[in-house]
């Protein structure tokens, strides 16, 4: 075979450096996204080809970075070790190129990019040459021109940030000037010569956090000039509640309030805990008679749930009510004036069911009169007496006479848009005491309904304690007999059982592939429809899977949540960590069925199996 190449070239084994292509930092920074993607594919293919022909070599760092989809600015080949020592840290940061894809930025000699598979190499190298030959006016000397600095450098980082965010392409003559000015503004804002990478990342996260806050709250927090995310979070947590009529201060020195706000200091954060014990009225929400009349049944139901949840929180932290056994007994008498809060008839509540014989039975049945009486000490004060209701309506909550007259009882209610005080001494995330309890289990394992309200009961004095006990101690746990895994949600358990049985009830109509879950089928159908609903706002790439865009976003944020416990090296994906750990354990799970050779990665096995198919073709 006459190839025209000297035979001396093939005496020494080929190395990865022989088929790699190097870039200087300036050259790499001027490549657009399409060129960088093409470079990544070529380099990874060269490495796989070397592995497929049984070329034993340790994986270069550049290949690991390319597999992680990291931004590279150089390859070790042809670049001295001291090339980057003179470059400041800011220049090493990867920059997104604003030039449109397909516009060549460099004339690069691509003859050094060699592949061992000529069927792939010939058309690909021709594609690269055609891409870079479109614009003959560009030269390496022109592209290596230093960026132009701004005529008037901005000393204030905040001003530089505003100019950076509000930059328009029409302000400059061309794309090169736009990129240079954006880079200069970003350096003046983030100050890489004085800040580390973590500090610059903190500034970016702080800006995004402030932008996500409501406008009034954001203006007040910005007026306090927080220097990091921790201070910003502390300021937001201090503002426990702000009514819609109130306005936050936007001017003034940090830590000072305008005169109008200083007159009403009760609405602003007070870090010291109150000396007196908290009561239910301290965390309750009041309604006037007119406001109560404007609430629809859904809002009143929500109000009922929220107030009982707050009551449960107080009981869970040791707050004691003044209820006794007499107050838990329903008191006969005519109904008092109060807001109309009828119970739903379809839930099974009736006038006959509302009068059990004993207090215990009354609490279990959830009679409205009993619960209203039991909740007298923890009701909301109303300024005016409540309007009377016409006779013949559904059972209504009773309001007490005497000192408690004019109070709104805690029967179903509340606006969708509510403002609640958050007490810092209450544990966050605690579920409310008034929840939909699971049905009781009879002797034969059948569900027993407790009352006609579908299992949802209001909470009296002892109800929060009982409910919390059931949540933490009486929750039913489903255990898999095959693998021993436990589940608290029966739906998750039923999905898990299909893994062992092999059941796949959800079938794709286009290709016939079956899935265990309907969500997996919907995700698969996007392959046929071409739908890619998840868009990266940083680079514009689209994805058809939420997990795929989550992994991609880590390339922008630099997050690596999967560290190796042996050497400490971190990875963006769990699969990369599992693959890396095989270098420590020596595990080679992928074996060749022809020769028995084992590999650590499936891609290496696939490349190796091609060598057997090529040998068969040559024998034929």
Swiss-Prot record:
<keyword id="KW-0238">DNA-binding</keyword>
<keyword id="KW-0678">Repressor</keyword>
<dbReference type="InterPro" id="IPR003309">
    <property type="entry name" value="SCAN_dom"/>
</dbReference>
<feature type="zinc finger region" description="C2H2-type 3">
    <location>
        <begin position="534"/>
        <end position="556"/>
    </location>
</feature>
<dbReference type="InterPro" id="IPR038269">
    <property type="entry name" value="SCAN_sf"/>
</dbReference>
<keyword id="KW-0805">Transcription regulation</keyword>
<keyword id="KW-0804">Transcription</keyword>
<feature type="domain" description="KRAB 1">
    <location>
        <begin position="14"/>
        <end position="85"/>
    </location>
</feature>
<dbReference type="GO" id="GO:0005730">
    <property type="term" value="C:nucleolus"/>
</dbReference>
<dbReference type="GO" id="GO:0006338">
    <property type="term" value="P:chromatin remodeling"/>
</dbReference>
<keyword id="KW-0677">Repeat</keyword>
<feature type="zinc finger region" description="C2H2-type 4">
    <location>
        <begin position="562"/>
        <end position="584"/>
    </location>
</feature>
<protein>
    <recommendedName>
        <fullName>Neurotrophin receptor-interacting factor homolog</fullName>
    </recommendedName>
</protein>
<dbReference type="InterPro" id="IPR036051">
    <property type="entry name" value="KRAB_dom_sf"/>
</dbReference>
<dbReference type="Pfam" id="PF02023">
    <property type="entry name" value="SCAN"/>
</dbReference>
<feature type="region of interest" description="Disordered">
    <location>
        <begin position="382"/>
        <end position="458"/>
    </location>
</feature>
<keyword id="KW-0863">Zinc-finger</keyword>
<keyword id="KW-0963">Cytoplasm</keyword>
<feature type="domain" description="SCAN box">
    <location>
        <begin position="161"/>
        <end position="243"/>
    </location>
</feature>
<keyword id="KW-0862">Zinc</keyword>
<feature type="zinc finger region" description="C2H2-type 1">
    <location>
        <begin position="478"/>
        <end position="500"/>
    </location>
</feature>
<comment type="subunit">
    <text>Interacts with SETDB1 and TRIM28/KAP1. Interacts with ATRX. Forms a complex with ATRX, SETDB1 and TRIM28.</text>
</comment>
<dbReference type="GO" id="GO:0005737">
    <property type="term" value="C:cytoplasm"/>
</dbReference>
<keyword id="KW-0539">Nucleus</keyword>
<dbReference type="Pfam" id="PF01352">
    <property type="entry name" value="KRAB"/>
</dbReference>
<dbReference type="InterPro" id="IPR013087">
    <property type="entry name" value="Znf_C2H2_type"/>
</dbReference>
<keyword id="KW-0479">Metal-binding</keyword>
<dbReference type="GO" id="GO:0003682">
    <property type="term" value="F:chromatin binding"/>
</dbReference>
<comment type="function">
    <text>Probable transcription repressor. Specifically binds to the 3'-end of zinc-finger coding genes and recruiting chromatin-modifying proteins such as SETDB1 and TRIM28/KAP1, leading to transcription repression. The SETDB1-TRIM28-ZNF274 complex may play a role in recruiting ATRX to the 3'-exons of zinc-finger coding genes with atypical chromatin signatures to establish or maintain/protect H3K9me3 at these transcriptionally active regions.</text>
</comment>
<dbReference type="GO" id="GO:0006357">
    <property type="term" value="P:regulation of transcription by RNA polymerase II"/>
</dbReference>
<comment type="similarity">
    <text>Belongs to the krueppel C2H2-type zinc-finger protein family.</text>
</comment>
<dbReference type="Pfam" id="PF00096">
    <property type="entry name" value="zf-C2H2"/>
</dbReference>
<dbReference type="GO" id="GO:0008270">
    <property type="term" value="F:zinc ion binding"/>
</dbReference>
<dbReference type="GO" id="GO:0000978">
    <property type="term" value="F:RNA polymerase II cis-regulatory region sequence-specific DNA binding"/>
</dbReference>
<feature type="region of interest" description="Disordered">
    <location>
        <begin position="324"/>
        <end position="370"/>
    </location>
</feature>
<dbReference type="InterPro" id="IPR001909">
    <property type="entry name" value="KRAB"/>
</dbReference>
<dbReference type="InterPro" id="IPR036236">
    <property type="entry name" value="Znf_C2H2_sf"/>
</dbReference>
<dbReference type="GO" id="GO:0000981">
    <property type="term" value="F:DNA-binding transcription factor activity, RNA polymerase II-specific"/>
</dbReference>
<feature type="zinc finger region" description="C2H2-type 2">
    <location>
        <begin position="506"/>
        <end position="528"/>
    </location>
</feature>
<feature type="compositionally biased region" description="Basic and acidic residues">
    <location>
        <begin position="343"/>
        <end position="355"/>
    </location>
</feature>
<feature type="zinc finger region" description="C2H2-type 5">
    <location>
        <begin position="590"/>
        <end position="612"/>
    </location>
</feature>
<feature type="domain" description="KRAB 2">
    <location>
        <begin position="278"/>
        <end position="351"/>
    </location>
</feature>
């Amino acid at each position: 075979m006459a190839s025209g190449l000297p035979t001396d070239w093939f005496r020494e084994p080929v190395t990865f450096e022989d088929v790699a292509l190097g870039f200087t930092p300036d050259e790499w920074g001027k490549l657009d996204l399409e060129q960088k993607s093409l470079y990544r594919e070529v380099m990874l293919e060269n490495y796989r080809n070397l592995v497929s022909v049984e070329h034993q070599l340790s994986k270069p760092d550049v290949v690991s970075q390319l597999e992680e989809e990291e931004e590279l600015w150089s390859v070790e080949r042809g670049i001295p070790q001291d090339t980057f020592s003179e470059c400041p840290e800011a220049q090493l940061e990867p920059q997104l190129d604003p030039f449109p894809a397909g516009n060549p930025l460099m004339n690069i000699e691509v003859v050094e990019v060699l592949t061992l598979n000529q069927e792939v190499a010939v058309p690909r190298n021709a594609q690269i040459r055609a891409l870079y030959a479109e614009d003959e006016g560009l030269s390496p000397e022109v592209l290596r021109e230093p960026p132009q600095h701004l005529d008037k450098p901005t000393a204030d980082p905040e001003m530089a940030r505003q100019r950076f965010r509000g930059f328009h392409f029409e302000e400059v003559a061309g794309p090169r000037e736009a990129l240079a000015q954006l880079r200069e503004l970003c350096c003046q804002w983030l100050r890489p010569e004085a800040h580390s990478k973590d500090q610059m990342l903190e500034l970016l996260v702080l800006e995004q956090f402030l932008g996500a806050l409501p406008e009034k709250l954001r203006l007040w927090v910005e007026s306090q000039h927080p220097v990091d995310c921790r201070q910003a979070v502390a300021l937001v947590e201090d503002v426990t509640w702000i009514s819609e009529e109130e306005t936050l201060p936007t001017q003034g020195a940090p830590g000072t309030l305008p005169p109008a706000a200083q007159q009403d200091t009760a609405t602003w954060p007070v870090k010291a805990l109150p000396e007196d014990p908290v009561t239910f009225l301290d965390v309750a929400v009041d309604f006037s008679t007119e406001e109560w009349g404007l609430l629809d049944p859904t809002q009143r139901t929500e109000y009922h749930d929220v107030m009982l949840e707050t009551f449960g929180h107080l009981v869970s932290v040791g707050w004691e009510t003044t209820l006794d056994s007499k107050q838990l007994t329903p008191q006969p008498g005519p109904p008092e004036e109060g807001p109309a809060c009828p119970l739903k008839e379809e839930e099974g509540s009736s006038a006959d069911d509302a009068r059990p014989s004993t207090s215990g039975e009354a609490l279990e049945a959830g009679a409205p009169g009993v619960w209203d009486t039991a909740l007298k000490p923890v009701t909301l004060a109303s300024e005016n007496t409540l309007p009377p209701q016409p006779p013949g309506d559904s059972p209504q909550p009773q309001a007490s006479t005497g000192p408690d007259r004019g109070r709104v009882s805690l029967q179903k209610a509340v606006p969708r848009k509510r403002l609640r005080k958050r007490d810092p001494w209450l544990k966050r995330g605690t579920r409310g005491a008034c929840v939909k309890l699971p049905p009781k289990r009879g002797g034969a394992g059948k569900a027993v309904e407790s009352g006609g309200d579908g299992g949802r009961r209001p909470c009296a004095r002892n109800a929060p304690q009982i409910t919390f006990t059931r949540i933490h101690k009486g929750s039913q746990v489903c255990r898999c007999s095959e693998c021993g895994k436990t589940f608290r949600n029966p739906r998750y358990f039923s999905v898990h059982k299909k893994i062992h049985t092999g059941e796949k009830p959800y079938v794709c109509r286009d290709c016939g592939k079956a899935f265990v879950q309907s969500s997996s089928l919907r995700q698969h159908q996007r392959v046929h429809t071409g739908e890619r609903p998840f868009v990266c706002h940083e680079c514009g790439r689209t994805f058809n899977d939420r997990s795929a865009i989550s992994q991609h976003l880590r390339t922008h944020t630099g997050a690596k949540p999967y560290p190796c416990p042996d050497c400490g090296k971190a990875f963006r994906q769990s699969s990369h960590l599992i693959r890396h750990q095989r270098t420590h354990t020596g595990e080679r799970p992928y074996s060749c069925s022809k020769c028995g050779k084992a590999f650590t990665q499936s891609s290496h096995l696939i490349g190796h199996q091609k060598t057997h198919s090529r040998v068969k073709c040559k024998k034929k």
